């Protein structure tokens, strides 16, 4: 199988077709949006993916302090695989739970704050790793926050970029209940 491969800021990118390695049997498009108020940016990634990563379909992480990270994964059997657009953000109220919150880029050791969970968010996610780019050093990242359900991610998930994206931690736990102050 061959798929379009490209990465860019925004909603589109110039792609080239490349052969995929097993077990990456599907073409896919990943849209990412990262917002740390008042700054927000989106990126697009077209690539070869394993069917296990395609099953993830979407993720939404509430990092707290009006910050979030969300992604949409759309896979198909054709070389050209257009992604789905982001819907508007849902309006949801705090639900009495909290998690550690971090959006750490360029470091795996970031200072934590409390992320107040909203709506159906009752789980805490903790993801850390390194992204290898054509820079003098790897880009480290550490993301913690509230999620509605635990994604089926593990350290063994392979993508076409296995040599460029190194997950070192994937944890999902129950959120803590806020104890009302007297």
From Swiss-Prot:
GO cellular component: extracellular region
Subcellular location field: Secreted
Key word Cell cycle present: no
Name this polypeptide is given: Phospholipase A2 inhibitor gamma subunit A
Organism taxonomic ancestry: Eukaryota, Metazoa, Chordata, Craniata, Vertebrata
UniProt keyword terms in alphabetical order: Disulfide bond, Glycoprotein, Phospholipase A2 inhibitor, Secreted
Subunit note: Heterotrimer of 2 subunits A and 1 subunit B.
Family membership noted in the UniProt record: Belongs to the CNF-like-inhibitor family.
